[in-house]
Each structure stands twice: as C-alpha cells, then as structure tokens.
Amino acid sequence: MKTDAHKNVQKKVGEKAGLIDEKTKENYFTIEVTNATLASECTPRVGSAPLAPTRSIFLILDINATLAADVADKVGGDPEESYMPLVAETFSVATEQGTPDRNVTSETAWGCFDDSVLLPPVVNPGQTVTGKLVLAVEVTQGRVAYDPQENGGWSWPYGD
C-alpha cells in the first residue's frame, strides 16, 4: 500500500478507497473519485453568468460514496450520529512546498452547479451518493486528499 508524505493511501482516479471491517473483511465505507477536472469557470447555482474562481482554478471532483447500513454496529456509537462527511472542508491538496492546503473552499466554488448535481454534505448509513464537489485550489497539478480527521486518508491525482 503506497502512501504519500501525509499518510494518505494513494489511489488512481476511478479506484475505490474505504474502511474495512476487520472481522468480515468487507468495506463499510467507500469513496471513489471518478473524475478530476480543472476549470476556469463553472455554471452557477443561481443566475446565468459563469462563476470564476477567486483562487487560481476550480478543481471539480466527481465522487461516489457508500456507507453500510450497519456501520454503527461495526464502529460502535449512536446510529443517528453515524455518517461520513463529504464537504469541501474534508479535502485538501498539496501546496508547491508539499504541505497540505486545507483552505480549498470559497464562495464562488460553493456557488457552482445546481444542487441536483452536487455531492450531498454527508453520506448516511445505507446510502450511496454521487455528485460533484468543487474546490478552489492554487496548484494545478498534484494530489487531492480526503482526510476528514487529518490523520491519514486517501489521495487521488489531478491535473495530469
């Protein structure tokens, strides 16, 4: 298993990542970046004029995520509070110096696309969700990481 300098397991675009139940060896959470596109503008949620990034460029991710219905049984805790966050704040990119840039949100990135095509903010037990997530980034090539607890997650390439 190849990891980057920030303890994120490296994946290819289209390759699933996930958390595995040690007993059953089955995934109870999966996340997959199926496409990573750079864009100098996006279609707005409201209005018709395209939005431009306030940072260098938009990084538009197409993501699939699934959370098992019985996740609370596997990890313990309250089923009502068992979910995985999918908001922009759980993602980062590496700066040119190699440090994580967790400031990948912006008002214009949030304003991109209609809600019907956007990734929901969480995946709940028993759900599979699909959608776009727009990040505001400075670096046009590198790796985008999903690491909600900032202790090691997964990363996918972009801008290649």
Regions found by a protein language model. Give the residues of each.
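Conserved functional micro-motifs across diverse proteins
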Residues: 1-160
